Regions:
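Alpha-helical packing segments of well-folded alpha/beta enzyme cores
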Residues: 13, 52, 85, 128, ...
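Contiguous beta-strand/loop segments that form the cofactor/metal-binding neighborhood of enzyme cores
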Residues: 180, 192, 197-199, 206-423, ...
Length: 476
């Protein structure tokens, strides 16, 4: 019998051990299969990809390959900051193999790669992550976890089936104050929860356009076919990539998809809800091509152990109140700085600037922002006088760093990253139901979670599970 283990099987052994009784009986590092430097493939090398790779290497990974649709080595002078970031990544990892197609890289490198970071536009998250997980590779994927609702369900399912270690890129999830607030809310510091309110001033990119911009010549350094990938074709224009794809239904998920995995995180995590019962959207400016200029979304959830007896709602607000799409300059023009936010009755004079959350319970409120001074504030009634402050129940991430937590999960020193796909998948699914509701404003949609259908609206199924371009199989 051959007892020799490959580096891939070492990592799989580590994950399997920690996922079971190893939690109670620590296993020596050598038995867990600790790797000196786990190897990583960076999918999406510029912009957020630069930060993800920096976080991964700081945690202890070795970058051996990069996949990006922009080959900066084919460019002359570089002025755009996102293109500059790609050049900086290539310079930082000069020995890393580079290709535009991550599928080819994964196939060619095989077991030489232990893990991947996925830092692409939203419409590539599913294919890159699923292929990696099915190949036994650990995955760190940027938010939102997926572009589509069915995709989010599948990501959580495949992560569980393969047993690889996963983490979604909502970095504040690793902050101590975030985890302490989850513990306090669950312990009842504000009583049973009735409402959650979250908001952002985004979009800060173009949304609300009625047709694509004119086609322009594709720069020689860009593999535009690979950028489009599984999504519907549109001719290249710099108004689409590298940044403004967020404002396209086919490639991004608007301000809601871009920011809710950050800002809704505290409320959703604290409540540990099942699927929402209903969702309804109010919005302004959505078109066939683009999400709205501003919106308000409300999800209704059934009662659980942390909620009031009637259940609870999550309420989302985005966008500037007085804004319009400027086609000539391909941007949003706003008048004034007022953006959608909760009522004064909710805020009670608290100003958390461009984003924030308020959790409303039967005995008080918790005001929260993701970082900075006074990151959370309690406003309670006399109920808090007899409140028993809970012991810590959630693990704390080393250095409050979600890259480090993911690395530690792979190495077997912690059981998992706390933003694992088993949590991130259902949260993303909930958020993307809100994105779907933006397409049919004013209509309360009833969600049948077991069948993944909107009750009475079969025609909306195409937005729940999208079709892919030839060559991009949904089964990978």
């Amino acid at each position: 019998m051959n007892r020799q283990l490959t580096r891939r099987s070492f990592v799989k052994v580590a994950g399997a051990a920690v996922g079971s009784s190893a939690l109670l009986h620590p296993v020596p590092l050598i038995a867990r299969g600790r790797l000196e430097k786990p190897t990583i493939l960076g999918i999406g090398a510029g912009g957020k990809g630069k930060a993800d790779l920096a976080g991964a290497t700081k945690a202890g990974f070795e970058v051996i390959a990069l996949a990006d649709v922009v080959d900066v080595k084919k460019l002359g002078s570089i002025t755009d900051k996102r293109t500059k970031s790609m050049a900086q990544v290539r310079d930082a990892y000069p020995q890393a193999r580079f290709e535009s197609d991550y599928r080819e890289l994964m196939a060619d490198l095989g077991d030489k790669v232990d893990a991947v970071t996925v830092s692409t536009p939203d419409h590539h998250h599913f294919h890159a992550s699923i292929k990696a997980m099915k190949s036994g590779k650990h995955v760190y994927c940027q938010k939102p976890l997926t572009h589509g609702i069915w995709e989010a369900r599948m990501m959580a399912k495949i992560a569980e089936e393969t047993g690889v270690k996963t983490q979604m890129g909502n970095q504040a999830h690793a902050n101590d104050h975030m985890r302490r607030c989850v513990e306090l809310i669950r312990a009842g510091v504000i009583g049973k929860v009735k409402e959650i309110h979250t908001w952002t001033n985004r979009p800060i990119w173009a949304q609300g356009f009625a047709s694509p911009p004119p086609a322009t010549k594709v720069p020689k350094a860009i593999d535009w076919k690979q950028w489009i990938g599984p999504a519907p074709w549109v001719d290249y224009n710099p108004a689409i990539a590298p940044f403004a794809w967020r404002g396209w239904w086919n490639y991004g998920t608007g301000a809601l998809g871009d920011m809710a995995c950050h800002i809704m995180d505290l409320g959703y995590w604290s409540m540990n809800p099942g699927p929402p019962e209903t969702v309804v959207a109010e919005q302004s400016g959505a078109t066939e091509f683009s999400p709205p200029i501003n919106s308000k979304i409300t999800w209704e959830f059934s009662p659980n152990e942390y909620s009031s007896k009637d259940g609870f709602t999550i309420n989302w607000y985005d966008g500037y109140v007085n804004a319009s799409f400027n086609r000539e300059d391909w941007k949003l023009d706003k008048v004034g700085n007022e953006y959608n936010h909760p009522s004064e009755e909710v805020l009670e004079g608290m100003d958390f600037e461009k984003f924030g959350s308020v959790i409303i319970g039967e005995h008080g409120k918790l005001f929260f922002k993701r970082s900075g001074k006074n990151a959370w504030v309690l406003k309670t009634d006399t109920h808090v006088d007899g409140f028993q402050w809970p012991e810590k129940s959630l693990p704390r991430a080393a250095g409050e760093d979600n890259y480090q937590e993911w690395y530690d999960a792979i190495q077997g020193t912690v059981s998992r990253g706390e933003s694992h796909f088993g949590l991130a998948g259902p949260m993303t699914e909930t958020i993307l139901l809100g994105v779907l509701a933006q397409r049919v404003p004013g209509e309360t949609l009833k969600w049948n979670a077991s069948k993944m259908k909107i009750v009475g609206r079969p025609e909306l199924g195409k937005f729940i599970r999208r079709e892919y371009s030839p060559g991009w199989d949904s089964t990978i």
